[in-house]
């Protein structure tokens, strides 16, 4: 596989993951964080950090729009639920394993 083919495959995998998460509006970010250490917000941060290397003027809200398929305000209004005490407790417990992201 050439480097260009690898980049194309990786981009397709990212798009498929984003599309899947856009379809799974029933899955809360806190549950993703608690189970895997990353969530939609992490994807936004990774995307934004990569985009800013290409275009320093890239806005974080553009990454949110791309990952969520809508503005973050729309997502919160339509799909985000209040985290339970158990979810919050688990979030704090698993914090050391959460993704560490810079440059977004």
Task: Give, region by region, the residue ranges found by the protein language model.
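Domain-level signature for proteins that mediate thiol-based redox and metal-cofactor handling
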Residues: 2-104
């Amino acid at each position: 596989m050439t480097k260009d083919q690898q980049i194309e495959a990786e981009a397709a995998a990212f798009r498929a993951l984003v599309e899947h998460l856009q379809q799974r509006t029933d899955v809360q970010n806190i549950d993703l964080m608690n189970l895997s250490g990353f969530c939609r917000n992490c994807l936004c941060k990774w995307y934004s950090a990569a985009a800013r290397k290409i275009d320093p003027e890239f806005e974080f809200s553009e990454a949110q729009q791309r990952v969520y398929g809508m503005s973050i305000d729309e997502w919160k209004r339509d799909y985000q639920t209040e985290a339970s005490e158990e979810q919050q407790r688990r979030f704090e417990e698993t914090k050391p394993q959460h993704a560490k992201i810079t440059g977004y």
